[in-house]
Amino acid sequence: MAGSVAIVGIFVALLAVAGEAAVFTVVNQCPFTVWAASVPVGGGRQLNRGESWRITAPAGTTAARIWARTGCKFDASGRGSCRTGDCGGVLQCTGYGRAPNTLAEYALKQFNNLDFFDISLIDGFNVPMSFLPDGGSGCSRGPRCAVDVNARCPAELRQDGVCNNACPVFKKDEYCCVGSAANDCHPTNYSRYFKGQCPDAYSYPKDDATSTFTCPAGTNYKVVFCP
């Protein structure tokens, strides 16, 4: 009997976790093909214009990212390279992409049973993006970065036709909020450029107050490239 009770308890716990998993619908509305990437769950998939991809992430997933890769070529084994967002020369990503790339970031079922999510330009920008709750939870707010940041990118930040951030370009403490600037980091002229283009998005590592969004655990989400 004790064993049966334990099994039932485990089953109920698994159902509870599954009930708070999040489904991410990734949609490509760009007028070109992208190779969507998602870690630590999902891997990667080619998305032609108008195509979508559904990813289920379990409750408790942290340090997660979704992004678009562009200009990719892969062989039949899934090996190749991308002009932007490349993740080690493979279609199925297991690690983060190479800057510059626009990032959707999330952590599920964290403090106060909340999901935390954002769009980050700390690694630069390659395609416009929105990251919004996908109905049903009563949660409606999320970040949008729908402008073409590349169009007015400062010349010194331009790379491969897209726009890098100052941190990966100059690797200085004041741009990366590390070392001497770890506890006293402020916006710079470069981060202000990104913030002016996309007020909802992270423009530098300490940009939490205006760039972090929350929804109740169990919310589903939609990430749109070129909204």
Swiss-Prot record:
Q: Is Signal there in the keyword field?
A: yes
Protein's UniProt keywords contain Signal: yes
- Name the UniProt key words of this record, in alphabetical order: Antimicrobial, Disulfide bond, Fungicide, Plant defense, Signal
* Pfam families assigned to the protein according to its UniProt record, in alphabetical order: Thaumatin
Q: Which InterPro entries match?
A: Osmotin/thaumatin-like_sf, Thaumatin, Thaumatin_CS
Coiled-coil stretches? none
Q: Which residues form the signal peptide?
A: 1-20
Disulphide-bridged cysteine pairs: 30-226, 72-82, 87-93, 139-215, 145-198, 153-163, 167-176, 177-185
GO biological process: one example: killing of cells of another organism
Instruction: Give a short account of what the protein does.
Output: Has antifungal activity. Inhibits Candida albicans and Trichoderma reesei; marginal inhibition observed against Alternaria solani and Neurospora crassa.
Family from the record: Belongs to the thaumatin family.
User: Protein name, please?
Assistant: Zeamatin
